[in-house]
Regions:
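Long, low-complexity, mixed-charge
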Residues: 1-221
């Protein structure tokens, strides 16, 4: 996949703290200002110049912007987790380290668990992140499984059940009320009907581990 989206990274210098903006590739998305400001505030840098940030994002060029005084603490690689409203997906985005350490699989699983993600974790998608370490990019690290609806029980009849009460019409236009075709002729041993039991379907689950039941079906005795 590679790094297509624009992203940002802290740069800690002797005299001040900067945020470095990396431009998007041709097919990539620019930085979302809300995502950037939330990241800065989360790391104790609320005194940024919003207009300067917006102008830098719109230029889509590599640049550094001062966002605060010296910030001596190292920043580790981190991940945000957003669980969809229906809890069927957990979308994660990663942010690069600044002098700190990168995340490993155990830390990713820990952060997913901390956000209530207990089921449907996609190990292959986690490995995909490690291959490219694409930042400010959506990775669907967990998916729920939709239930499979079943079918009602049914009876299949092996004789004519479509009773037609219309009298037989003769060639001369008259009708014969004695021929109503309401009787099916059978012999001993003929299979008259077969009961097909209900199919209850297959249960699903969301990423929070909650069971999702299929639609209720009708049974027959």
């Amino acid at each position: 996949m590679g790094q297509a989206n624009a992203y940002f990274q802290f740069v800690i210098k002797e005299h001040a703290t900067y945020i470095k903006l990396f431009p998007a590739a041709l097919e990539g998305n620019v930085i979302e200002i809300g995502e950037l400001t939330e990241y800065l505030e989360r790391h104790g840098c609320p005194d940024y110049n919003l207009k300067e940030l917006v102008a830098a994002i719109n230029s889509n060029e590599m640049t550094e912007i001062m966002v605060g005084d010296i910030y001596p603490i190292q920043i580790n690689e981190e991940m945000s987790v957003t669980v969809s409203a229906d809890a069927m997906e957990a979308v994660c985005r990663f942010y690069p380290a600044a002098g700190g350490t990168n995340m490993n699989v155990q830390e990713i699983l820990r952060d997913l668990t901390a956000k209530g993600v207990k089921a449907g974790v996609d190990q292959d998608e986690i490995l995909k992140f490690f291959q490219d370490r694409a930042y400010c990019t959506d990775f669907v690290l967990a998916k729920g499984k939709k239930p499979v609806d079943g079918q009602d029980a049914r009876i299949e009849y092996y004789f004519n059940t479509d009773v037609d009460l219309k009298p037989k019409k003769n060639e001369d236009g008259s009708v014969d009320y004695r021929e109503l075709n309401v009787i099916s002729y059978i012999k001993e041993g003929d299979l008259l009907a077969k009961l097909f039991p209900e199919d209850r379907g297959i249960k699903g689950y969301d990423v929070q581990g909650r069971e999702i039941k299929p639609k209720q079906v009708r049974s027959l005795q």
